[in-house]
Amino acid sequence: MDYKAIFYILNAEDDTENAVCKIIKKHYELKNAVLVSSKDKTLIERINKLLWTFEQLSFIPHSTDKKYDSFTNIILVETGYKNDSILKKDYNVFINLDDEVKTDYHDHEIIVELVKANEDKKKIAREKYLYYKNNKLNVKHENL
């Protein structure tokens, strides 16, 4: 399988929640199954709420680890969530909202990372980039 990591470059004015919703929408339209993970429980809750109102004319079906719906291809979970019957579903896209690199990337075809405008976050993104590149993932950058 050809694994890839996509780094989305965020502008200073881009907020994480809107950026994630745009990325989810893009992959939803491509019929991908998306797993979004963050240690930040409130970030997951904010993204969940925003997905309900993100666009007036469209709805992106999704669920969370708290209210799981097996018919949706998009799930938002807290990092460390351990329900294998849910996590072993074939989520081909993993959106990593944590500072740590996704080392078990073999579970997903596409790893999505966000590159935020501040220097500390850029440094973390560079480290992730090198990790994925050194592990032979096809790495690319996209603007949001």
Residue ranges and their predicted role:
Residues 42-46, 120-122:
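Short, charged/polar "capping" segments at the starts of alpha-helices
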Residues 82-107:
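SF2 helicase motor core recognition
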Residues 1-43:
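Long, hydrophobic N-terminal alpha-helical segment
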Residues 37-39, 77-79, 95-98, 114:
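Short His-Asn-centered micro-motif
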Residues 31, 71-72, 91, 107-109:
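Short, well-ordered alpha-helix to beta-strand connector turns
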Residues 48-88:
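Helix-adjacent hinge/juxtasegments
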Residues 109-144:
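Glycine-rich, aromatic-bearing surface loops/beta-hairpins
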